[in-house]
Amino acid sequence: MPKDAPAGLAPGFLVAAPALADPNFNGSLVLMAEHHAQGALGFVVNRPGPITVADVLGGLDERLRERAEGAGRADDPVLVGGPVQPERLWILFRPGPTAPEEGAVALGSGLALGGSRELLEALVRSRDPGPYLLLLGYAGWAPLQIEHEVGEGAWVPLPLQGDLVFDVPMEKRWETAVRRLGLDPAGFLVGGGGAEA
């Protein structure tokens, strides 16, 4: 059984305000996985990177790439999860009847997160893995940094809603999150800030 994630702003989302000029986070929707006294960790879930699932899996094991092709997942983009450790691979997935749980953290709202090669291989090899995203890198904040940025209006917290990740097209996730906050994306203007790189 997956262990639980820490409380605070996580699990949840941070919706970037339009005035957030940092190119790593402008227009981003960040899934917050950890938030505690030592800082915070999250993943941008709406920024496709230049490589695909097939590129990553083919680099690990050609049979995994072939399974992804057979499942119609080979051309899915790998997301840019954030500027910290951009070579580190993470897996965000919706646990299902055959999806592995070993090595994963349950975030709630039907989402789980892991970062091991074993988890990725088990997920791709499972009979019906369900939806998953691969992400490279993460967003990290020093102690009290994200609280300061939220206070300045650079980010607006949104409760965790798993459908935003897997049921809303990537290019519509930020706009959908803004609308769920009860705001009009065209008129959503607040302060600035940024996460640490």
Swiss-Prot record:
Domain of life: Bacteria
A Pfam family per the record: DUF179
Gene Ontology CC: cytosol
InterPro entries to which the protein is assigned, alphabetical: AlgH-like
HAMAP family found in the cross-reference section: UPF0301
Family according to the record: Belongs to the UPF0301 (AlgH) family.
Protein name: UPF0301 protein Adeh_3962
Phylogenetic classification of the source organism: Bacteria, Pseudomonadati, Myxococcota, Myxococcia, Myxococcales
